[in-house]
Amino acid sequence: MEQPIVEFDNHYMLYITTFDDSNNPTGTYFYSSNNKLNEIFDNISNNNLNTNSHLENNARITDAKSDEDNDGINDKIIINYETSNDGIIKAEKKDIKLIFFLKYRLIKQVKLIMTPMIYLDIPILDKGAKNIKLNGDIELVQKSPIISTTITSQLYNYENPFYDIDTKLNSPFDFYYYYNKYKNLNYTLKYNYEKNEQDSSDKLGINIEINIPKLQRVFYIQSIFETIKYAWMQYFYIFLPIYIILYLIYKFIIESNIFYSHVKSDL
């Protein structure tokens, strides 16, 4: 068990749908950290003359981190989304979907590097500006044990991750495919959070606090080299009590003269 090393990866996708009182969609807003994807969404909206689809240029996403015990490993990551878009704020209802990515590393007992996805679906059921706070812990979810090796297991590559969508997405809505694909992986990250909602003056804000566990439980299988490396210790602890018992029996036989000997000593 060890504390994972976690950082914000600065990649995100935001998709907001607004509704009227009868739950009819009135608009869609999209924004991401990928300029190519933003262009695709903008072109789709303009070519289809869909005045209800908008690129959410007012979106502002920032992040911060906290190392409470000064050990060089983040204990908390904070991600903030904020907008002053009237079309979103004044809508009767809205549904906010936010996907962002983290960098996650284990380096001691097992060596694991991955770029996990966090998917949030946040409904807001009334009108007006809001401050929404999410606070929770991340949890490593495993469908199978990790094979412990001396080579780092790269589930995703930082330089060419699966969310590098320049050549993989034909529309902004295809990210559902990648999210469903991500959910089926052997190792994923789950964000267990509580939600608190308050009225605000003029902006819609989402504050996401991610607490990083001090000890992350990991299920893994030892490699054959690791097994051989520590096998002699197991044999030693098994044969040590047997050796002590045999020695005590031998000592008892000698001291009790159970077997007579013809060896004569001049001492």
Outline where the language-model segments fall.
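Long, compositionally biased interface segments
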Residues: 182-267
